[in-house]
A protein has these predicted regions:
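Generic recognition of long tandem-repeat/solenoid scaffolds
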Residues: 1, 32-38, 109-116, 124-126, ...
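Extracellular modular ligand-binding repeats in secreted and cell-surface proteins
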Residues: 1-52
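Short glycine-aromatic motifs
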Residues: 12-19, 79, 96-99, 106, ...
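Short tyrosine-centred short linear motifs in exposed loops/low-complexity segments
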Residues: 26-31, 130-132, 185-187
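Terminal, low-complexity interaction segments
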Residues: 54-87, 141-207
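Extracellular glycan-recognition surfaces and repeat-rich motifs
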Residues: 74-107
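Short beta-strands within extracellular/lumenal beta-sheet-rich domains
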Residues: 103-133, 141-142, 175-180, 197-201
């Protein structure tokens, strides 16, 4: 069905309807998008299927250009980033210097995610199929920040950062740094900061 006002009933020009509250899909629920044709005023509604996360495979996951979000966004099969409490995650284009990271551990990427605070507001979620190592690449420019892995977000916030198999510290630096976190068994895990904001460049999963 074409637009009744356009010549020869050309296709509608669909734009998000700013008068209605569209929602983004999550793992728990579908989202919904409301559209309107500004030429004739016709409306349509689109269901956005809920996120099916799956399990993460061995290999590299890098930051994805997601703009600025306050919801969940899938980075790769088995991996998403998400926000709570009206917090936001912001994608920033450009590359950090590799600094002292050996060439064999470097990889091509276009930008990074600014995880602007503690895990209670901004987190990475992973479904892993077994014991694995997460080689995590990131930084923080103005202070040291501790990042950890746990089976719940609350456990990150209450973490004992002396457990160096699960919690690593990015020192204050403009350069990307490489840190290693060990996961003991299959399950769902959250990555996030105990002490403040940090920049996520990527991670390499090894089973």
């Amino acid at each position: 069905e074409g637009c009744e006002i356009k010549k020869d009933y050309a296709a509608h020009t669909w734009e998000l309807d700013s008068t209605k509250a569209s929602t983004h899909p999550t793992e728990e629920a579908d989202g919904v998008a409301y559209y309107v044709c500004p030429t004739c005023g016709k409306e349509k509604t689109e269901t956005l299927p809920k996120i099916v996360l799956g399990s993460v495979s061995a290999g590299l996951i890098t930051a994805k250009n997601i703009g600025k979000i306050s919801w969940q966004e899938k980075l790769a099969e088995g991996c998403l980033v998400g926000c709570n409490n009206d917090k936001t995650i912001v994608y920033k284009s450009g590359q950090l210097s590799w600094g002292s990271i050996a060439e064999e551990n470097q990889f091509a990427y276009d930008g990074y995610l600014n995880m602007g605070g503690a895990a209670s507001g901004r987190y990475i979620k992973l479904n892993v199929t077994g014991k694995c190592t997460i080689t995590l690449f990131g930084n923080m420019t103005n202070k040291a920040v501790t990042v950890g892995a746990a089976t719940t977000i609350e456990d990150i916030n209450e973490a004992n950062s002396s457990d160096t198999t699960k919690f690593v510290t990015f020192t204050s630096s403009k350069n990307a740094q490489m840190k290693t976190i060990t996961i003991d068994e299959a399950g769902t895990y959250y990555l996030g900061s105990v002490t403040g904001g940090w920049n996520f460049v990527g991670m390499n999963i090894t089973y």
